[in-house]
């Protein structure tokens, strides 16, 4: 489930920087939740265009770092751990299983 949350966060930060919808971004993150997370810019595209052609590497590195610490930012702002986003991620996985929609999720 962490992969779904982290991928959504990564896509959101990229979308904000590029002024596009997160729905137009395809991205892949590997590893655990937090510092061990590995976003893969090589496999990140915006409407099929590699993100590395749309944004400079320094800005991309900053977005990756923000993605890694984004959960902690949320906890500091809310004063508690998130509950809505993990629930929504779990619901997406359950729906995909029940409906046999053959969706691929980045989970660990």
Protein language model annotation of sequence segments:
Residues 15-108:
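Long, compositionally biased stretches enriched for glycine and/or charged residues
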Residues 1-11:
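Rossmann-like NAD(P)(H) cofactor-binding subdomain of soluble oxidoreductases
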């Amino acid at each position: 489930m962490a992969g779904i949350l982290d991928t959504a966060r990564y896509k959101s930060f990229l979308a904000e920087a590029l002024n596009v919808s997160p729905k137009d971004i395809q991205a892949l993150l590997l590893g655990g939740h937090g510092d061990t997370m590995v976003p893969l810019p090589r496999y990140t595209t915006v409407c099929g265009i590699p993100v590395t052609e749309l944004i400079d590497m320094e800005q991309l590195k900053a977005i990756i770092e923000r993605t890694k610490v984004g959960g902690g930012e949320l906890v500091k702002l809310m004063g508690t751990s998130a509950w809505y986003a993990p629930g929504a991620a779990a619901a997406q996985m359950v729906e995909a299983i029940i409906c046999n929609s053959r969706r691929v999720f980045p989970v660990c």
